[in-house]
Amino acid sequence: MAVKVGINGFGRIGRIVFRNAVEHPEIEVVAVNDPFIDPEYAAYMLKYDSSHGVFKGEIKKDADGLIVNGKKVKFHTERDPSAIPWKASGAEYIVESTGVFTTTEKAKAHLTGGAKKVIISAPSADAPMYVMGVNEKTYDGKADVISNASCTTNCLAPLAKVIHDKYTIVEGLMTTVHSYTATQKTVDGPSGKDWRGGRGAAQNIIPSSTGAAKAVGKVIPDLNGKLTGMSMRVPTPNVSVVDLTVRIEKGATYDEIKATVKEAANGSLAGILGYTEDDIVSSDMNGNTNSSIFDAKAGISLNKNFVKLIAWYDNEWGYSRRVLDLLAYVAKADASK
């Protein structure tokens, strides 16, 4: 039986989570909340997407929500999460995708309306973070609010795990070459303390900070303090790429490392970690459901202990699929208790 899900925040991730849910056999979205748009506009935004194309299905608007592929989706417009009547539509698991309620205290407000559990689709300062294929098995059901970490952590962590398990990472640096996002500016404008972040997204390569590499230490405790990184925001609308440069304890040729990653991609991490030897570019990865796609031809090694590894990720589509996979995993674990 499908898990009944509510989505709070119908922005980029909220809508892409919805699109992925339509394809996910274990998930049924029964309610959406967004105080800034009405159902008619929500239907339009769900149907048409500049990066992912026209919705493959039927969307209709009715009196109090949407009908998607014949199924009713209740639409709410509450600003306060505690006021959203999730129970009325049967939504038990909530995807918190506003980018605003990212702490346990703020996200717990959803429980007031009848939700059982909240999954934050962003990093959290205090909620337990889980990355599918890395540490989801440590979930014990005690926390009401959990985080799916960031799209970049979801790309980096599975690859780092494979390398660390086989060769032991001594230390490493990561750079994510990241497509621009909604928080950036279309033209130069004020941006608080991040002056570079206020420059036009489509005109510049913008150095930026990211906590994605450090967050790997939270999901792989053995790597805590051994990885850090930065971001380069670039003028592409979707798909990003991680450059992970590491020093490894157990020496290996690049071909040996490729074989290790390929084995994991075809085995224990199938559907999470991809592997390709094709001459791909970023747009080829648009719509890819993996968290991370290892580019075997793009990496290089200096010697047997120092290597640069490259992995692509659709920072919208792949990440949103993992949000739902984590949700389905958690719901199944909760039901077995």
From Swiss-Prot:
According to its UniProt record, which reaction does this protein catalyse? D-glyceraldehyde 3-phosphate + phosphate + NAD(+) = (2R)-3-phospho-glyceroyl phosphate + NADH + H(+)
Where NAD(+) binds, per the record, is at 12-13, 34, 79, 315
CDD domains associated with the record: GAPDH_I_C, GAPDH_I_N
Query: If you read the UniProt record, what top EC class would you report for this enzyme, in one word?
Result: oxidoreductase
List residue numbers at the site (Activates thiol group during catalysis).
178
Q: Which GO terms describe its cellular component?
A: cytosol
Biological process (GO), any one: glycolytic process
Tell me what this protein is called: Glyceraldehyde-3-phosphate dehydrogenase
- Look up the record and name the pathway of this protein: Carbohydrate degradation; glycolysis; pyruvate from D-glyceraldehyde 3-phosphate: step 1/5
Subunit description: Homotetramer.
Q: Which species is this record about?
A: Claviceps purpurea (strain 20.1)
NCBIfam families found in the cross-reference section: GAPDH-I
Q: Where does D-glyceraldehyde 3-phosphate bind?
A: 150-152, 181, 210-211, 233
What are the protein's UniProt keywords? Cytoplasm, Glycolysis, NAD, Oxidoreductase
